Amino acid sequence: MTDQGENEKKQRRSNATIAVACLSFFVCMIGAAYASVPLYRIFCQVTGYGGTTQRVEQYSDTILDKTIKVRFDANIANGLPWDFKPMQREVTVRIGETTMIKYEAHNLFGEETYGRASFNVAPGRAGAYFNKVECFCFTDNTLKPGEDLELPVVFFVDPEFVNDPDLKDVKTITLSYTFFPIDKPKPVVNAKAVGSTRNGG
């Protein structure tokens, strides 16, 4: 009986060890999954991988004679009652030339709604050379009931585009946006105003 009891205790300890190991592995996998999203986003922004465009603060100093066609695509995710489309379907621009185009959005719902745009470029490798100076995708967007909103994008294609051997046959780039519904943005608290109110009270 004693040997049997010891064996049962060892078995329970072994089972408990396995359970703890499995739980730890599961928790680590969840943590890795959550961490991989922002890390992947940062990687894409730095390298242009997956068609992620680049955000820049200044215009190109060089404009080439070579031109490229840029097409514009618009999509709406489920749950966002907007009509969203480019105001022009395509433009032909000189590489390095700064260009502004506009999308437009219309709220079809009877209440205020909120959207956030994701974006990518095709072919994916071209994303490393597609630079946006201004874009509605940099911030969240709010539309009142029935409101129409023009959404500008200011961009240029980096002149280094022509030096990439993998893109030598590319004549057209497609810039695509998808709007997703989001919760109502939280109001920004004015710390100075709050402090003044407290001091005055």
UniProtKB/Swiss-Prot annotation:
An example molecular function term from Gene Ontology annotations: copper ion binding
Subcellular location, record wording: Cell inner membrane
Residues annotated as transmembrane: 14-36
Topological relation to the membrane, as annotated: Single-pass type II membrane protein
Tree of life domain: Bacteria
Keyword Transmembrane helix: yes
Gene3D superfamilies on file: Ctag/Cox11
Segments in the Periplasmic topological domain: 37-201
Gene Ontology CC, one term: plasma membrane
Chain ranges on the Cytoplasmic side, renumbered to this chain: 1-13
UniProt-listed InterPro entries: CtaG/Cox11_dom_sf, Cyt_c_oxidase_assmbl_CtaG
Keyword vocabulary terms for this entry: Cell inner membrane, Cell membrane, Copper, Membrane, Signal-anchor, Transmembrane, Transmembrane helix
GO biological process: respiratory chain complex IV assembly
Its job: Exerts its effect at some terminal stage of cytochrome c oxidase synthesis, probably by being involved in the insertion of the copper B into subunit I.
UniProt family annotation: Belongs to the COX11/CtaG family.
Descriptive protein name: Cytochrome c oxidase assembly protein CtaG
Source organism per UniProt: Brucella suis (strain ATCC 23445 / NCTC 10510)
Gene (UniProt): ctaG
